[in-house]
Structure formats: C-alpha cells, structure tokens
Swiss-Prot record:
Example GO BP: NAD biosynthetic process
Encoding gene (name): nadD
Protein name according to UniProt: Probable nicotinate-nucleotide adenylyltransferase
PANTHER family found in the cross-reference section: NICOTINATE-NUCLEOTIDE ADENYLYLTRANSFERASE-RELATED (PTHR39321), PHOSPHOPANTETHEINE ADENYLYLTRANSFERASE (PTHR39321:SF3)
Function text: Catalyzes the reversible adenylation of nicotinate mononucleotide (NaMN) to nicotinic acid adenine dinucleotide (NaAD).
InterPro entries: Cyt_trans-like, NadD/NMNAT, Rossmann-like_a/b/a_fold
Coiled coil: none
GO molecular function terms noted in the UniProt entry: ATP binding; nicotinate-nucleotide adenylyltransferase activity
EC numbers for this chain: 2.7.7.18
NAD is among the record's keywords: yes
Length: 193
C-alpha cells in the first residue's frame, strides 16, 4: 500500500488540507493519505494551539473522504520530530510505502527542521506548489541540496516506488487558504468563536 503522510498542527484544519490530500492521492497514485495531527510544532509558538482532541475532531469533519485517515500517532508514540515519526512508521509498518507530503511553504524552511537531511534520506517527498511561495521554495537551501534527487513532475506517480532521497514538485493546485489566515488574533478559529 502507498501512503502519503501529511503532518501538521491542523490549527484549524481546512478545505485546502483535503484538496492537497486528494491532489496527492491522484497525482502520486496513493492508496491513502494519513493526516498526522501533531501535539505541538517545534518551529512554532504553541500558545494558541487548540487542544489535540478538538483539532482531531475538526480534521475528521474536514477530511470527509474514506481515503484520508486522521491520526494522533505522534501523541501516542510520543515523538516530537518528524524524523522520529517516520522512523517509527517505517520500522513498524515495513510493508507500506510512504511519501511525505508538504506545501512549498514548508520546503522553503525545511532546512530548519530537525534532521531534515535524514528525513529526505528515509522517505520520498512530494512538495505541493503554494503560490506565491514557489520561487522561495525552489531557491531554498533544502531544494538546492536535494536538487539532483528531484523527479520530473510527469514522473510523480513513480515517487512512492523510488528509494529516498527522491522528491517531486507538483504544480496545478491553486489554493489560497492557510491555517494562520483562519485564526483570530487571540488564536480562536474564525467562525468558531
């Protein structure tokens, strides 16, 4: 089975998360996408982070697709960093082929992630374009360091079968939603106050 992993705080989850997942399911020919709702993000201030249970329920409501599974795995296995989550999944679920899914905004700062080179060496990565982040993402330290492992976009369906490091930059999905834009200044979710 080919499984896409979309990690994040989902604070709040929104239609773009579902659209990204459905886009990845189709373009990467995945069987499932797992939303890994993190208990906290080491690169962000977590003061306005809603309770994990509330984010999980909201994510389930938004996902609304049987191929998208919402998980609090990182809380259960007590991992803080993506590399630890990926290593645990690969060790426990050896028969699955994983692809890490991220937006172009995350590629732009991927070099700040804990053990980002090891992440790239453990699992293929699909980067979903998020204009206007395209240039910044493709000019980022991580994109430059991994440039020789980039697949042409027309080979995206082969990504799950490629040994890491391998990555693809997928264009064509035009979305202008972000969790940051859906939060009020006090951290509450817009429309949920």
């Amino acid at each position: 089975m080919r499984v896409g992993l979309l990690g994040g705080s989902f604070n709040p989850p929104h239609q773009a998360h579902r659209a990204i997942s459905q886009f990845a399911l189709k373009r990467l020919q995945l069987d499932r996408v797992w939303w890994l709702v993190t208990p906290g993000n080491p690169l962000k201030e977590n003061g306005t982070l809603h309770e994990l249970g509330a984010r999980m329920q909201a994510a389930r409501d938004v996902a609304n697709d049987p191929r998208i599974e919402v998980s609090c795995l990182e809380s259960v296995i007590r991992t803080r960093y993506t590399i630890d989550t990926i290593n645990t999944l690969r060790r426990r679920l050896r028969g699955l082929r994983f692809v890490w899914i991220m937006g172009a905004d995350n590629l732009a700062q991927f070099h700040r992630w804990q053990d980002w080179r090891r992440i790239a060496g453990q699992v293929p990565i699909a980067v979903i374009d998020r204009p206007p982040q395209s240039f910044r993402a493709l000019a980022s330290p991580a994109a430059k360091a991994l440039s020789r492992y980039r697949l042409p976009e027309n080979e995206a369906a082969l990504l799950a079968d490629r040994p890491a490091p391998a990555w693809v930059f997928l264009t064509g999905l035009k979305l202008n939603l972000s969790s940051t834009g859906l939060r009020n200044p006090d951290g509450s979710w817009k429309g949920t106050k």
